Amino acid sequence: MKNPIVTFEMEDGTSFRAELYPEIAPNTVANFVRLVESKFYDGLIFHRVIPGFMIQGGDPTGSGMGGPGWHIRGEFRLNGFDNPLKHARGVLSMARSMQKDSAGSQFFVMHADAAHLDGQYAAFGKVIEGMDAVDKVASAKTGAQDRPVEEQRIL
């Protein structure tokens, strides 16, 4: 079976494509694909942007506190799950609270390598095309709580 490929088209006309790895994080990928196919992410923003680190989106409230109404098991080493994918530039990973099994819909794309996240968060895919779109989001001017002043919206 081929790995799923997802495309994020941005309001500014740029886009990026990511390959997802179900052999590394099967439940995480199944959840993410379900959200993409249901158009959950359409119209949402990247609400947290830290250049040289990551861009984060997937919150329907745009506040950093929202989700889909459910949580999934965290597929990462700290939670007893072997996930060898490193948090390198372009890698997709699930955001969560301090609770290990609290991921739902919020995800982040690594703008740079961040080895300190390895084993702490469920990495599950990698940008294979359009890192320039990720770079553009990461370069957006931000205000309080690393929120872009100009919304970085997914179509």
Language-model-detected regions and their locations in the chain:
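Cyclophilin-like peptidyl-prolyl cis-trans isomerases
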Residues: 1-155
